[in-house]
Amino acid sequence: MKPELIIFDWDGTLADTTRPIIRTFQQSFADCGLKAPDADAIRALIGYSLPEIIFRLAPNAGEHLREELAETYAAHYLNPNNHNMTLFPEAIPCLNTLKQQGFWLAVATGKGRTGLDRSITVSYTHL
């Protein structure tokens, strides 16, 4: 049986989002008066939920501070002026080929729908 639907992950599969995610976490921590986490520590957690990443990066932070970090991260991430992620070079040709072959295409992500929509709307409305 031939599959009809192909589901792709967004972060790290279609889009190269590592640098923007790291930069956004580091800025958020600084904005909340905390030492910015090391890039490698953040990179190792990409793919986990936002609350889980914050808990792992700031295990001693209280609930209020973790909520503030999450709100600050979301505000930075959703700011259209901070958009600078790119799709991997092979992503669009691959998606176009699969679409032409009649496959339904979808994106799954651990980020909220608002974040995904923003990423797509800013630069990739042709997808």
Q: Which sequence ranges carry the predicted segments?
A:
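Active-site neighborhood of HAD-like aspartate-dependent phosphohydrolases
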Residues: 2-44
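Helix-loop "lid/cap" segments that line or gate small-molecule binding pockets
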Residues: 28-29, 49-63, 119
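Metal-dependent phosphoesterase signature
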Residues: 55-93
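Alpha-helix N-cap/helix-start and coil->helix boundary motif
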Residues: 22, 47, 51, 92, ...
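Conserved small/polar residues in nucleotide/adenosyl-binding loops
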Residues: 125-126
